[in-house]
A protein has these predicted regions:
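Short coil turns that delineate tetratricopeptide repeat
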Residues: 19, 53, 87, 129, ...
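Acidic, serine/threonine- and proline-enriched intrinsically disordered linkers and terminal tails
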Residues: 176-240
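Helix-start (N-cap) detector for alpha-helical repeat units in TPR-like alpha-solenoids
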Residues: 21-23, 55-57, 73, 98, ...
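Structural register within alpha-helical repeat arrays
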Residues: 28, 61-62, 104, 154, ...
Length: 241
């Protein structure tokens, strides 16, 4: 019926009657989303999250709504409440949290930050490459354990792994970035990017990341990412003919 005026009237009465029910704030946030007010929807989801700080699902949805409202930094801080390492860094990439990467990439693309949009789409691409490569570890295991049903299901899944919605979104998103880059003056973009790259590579953050990578003995591509801000990736992308 899309009678938002009546819907808000009833939901406000319900919240006034029992202001501690989380679901009421969630429903009101959804109403604002349907009405097209993402800013208010994100605020209400954050209010709902604060009523139950132990609810991981609410935390994730509140983060999603913040990203869709282009509040990426605030969303990262919210996600960090449940998804961070001992050093305080987010582990969403290590956990293959593709919805988060996809939403962040789309937000950065809307903001015109092609570097970080490309980096987040690249994270998703790496996840699927890793999933595809991991099948080789399962070949001998599946045959040795005679788990043929699971083995054949795995083979069928790997044949269509790149049809996954996140793989498709990442591919289309990368194409959108490429189209935006193709419209730029590449010489000017490279000249503008060069001092940013030099400043970042001389920063304390970058040097600390490189020192930590040298100390680690695992081969995790996400924990040992030498280019977490996507400067090298974007610089190479811009230099393509």
């Amino acid at each position: 019926m899309r009678n938002f005026e009546k819907a808000f009237e009833y939901i406000n009465q319900a919240i006034e009657h029992t202001p501690t029910v989380v679901d009421l704030y969630v429903l009101k946030a959804k109403l604002y989303k349907r009405a097209g007010d993402l800013r208010r929807a994100a605020t209400l989801y954050d209010e709902a999250r604060k009523l139950d700080l132990a609810d991981r699902y609410l935390n994730a949805v509140a983060s999603r709504y913040k990203i869709r409202n282009d509040q990426v930094k605030e969303a990262e801080e919210t996600m960090a409440l449940f998804s961070k390492e001992t050093d305080g860094s987010l582990n969403v990439h290590d956990m293959q949290c593709m919805w988060y990467e996809s939403e962040c990439a789309a937000a950065y693309l809307r903001q015109g930050n092609l570097r970080l949009a490309l980096k987040n789409y690249n994270f998703i691409e790496k996840h699927f490459d890793q999933i595809y490569e991991d099948q080789f570890d399962f070949h001998l295991y599946g045959l040795r354990k005679f788990a043929l049903n699971a083995y054949f299901e795995m083979l069928e899944m790997e044949d269509r792994v790149y049809r996954n919605k996140y793989a498709v979104r990442a591919a289309l998103g990368t194409i959108k970035v490429a189209r935006r880059v193709s419209k730029l003056n590449k010489e000017e973009e490279s000249a503008k990017l060069k001092p940013e790259v030099e400043e970042y590579k001389n920063s304390k953050e970058y040097k600390q990341i490189q020192d930590e990578i040298r100390k680690k003995d695992d081969d995790d591509d996400f924990k040992n990412d030498p280019d977490p801000r996507g400067y090298d990736l974007y610089e190479n992308f811009v230099s393509l003919p």
